[in-house]
Amino acid sequence: MQKILVVDDDKDLLEMVEMTLSRLGYHITTLAKGSGFFNVVESIRPDIILLDIFLGDADGRILCNKMKLQSAYENIPVILYSAGYVPLSTIEHSKADEFMIKPFEIKQLTEKVKKLLGLQ
């Protein structure tokens, strides 16, 4: 079973994504803040990460960039997303594999997840 880490401070979105992706057969781990991100990545070794940019206590772009600089985690695909304006250059610098604007259609999210996991 493939593992997905979802990091977002919006509890409603976390629940929706967890419920939807669980039904598709993925094992979901959720995190409601940026602190603890690296500990969770190390402990569960997710196959893909869905990461909000504007977390209450962290910037998802920075978390993504720091993770991708570590050889043990550089190949984990990351989908960054945000409801606010984000300059494209900062997304590119983060080394994220995909970017989405909230609100997004859950079908669009599942298609991107499947694509990055090589299932499509």
Question: Predicted segment positions?
Answer:
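The feature encodes the CheY-like receiver
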Residues: 14, 56, 65, 102
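Charged docking surfaces used in two-component/phosphorelay signaling
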Residues: 15-23
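Short hydrophobic/Thr-rich beta-strand motif most characteristic of the beta2 strand and flanking loop
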Residues: 25-33, 40
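Acidic catalytic/metal-coordinating carboxylates
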Residues: 33, 59-62
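Active-site residues of response regulator receiver
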Residues: 52
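Short amphipathic alpha-helix used as the core "switch/output" element in two-component signaling
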Residues: 61-72
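Alpha4 helix (beta4-alpha4-beta5 surface) of REC/receiver domains from two-component response regulators
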Residues: 62, 84-101, 107-111
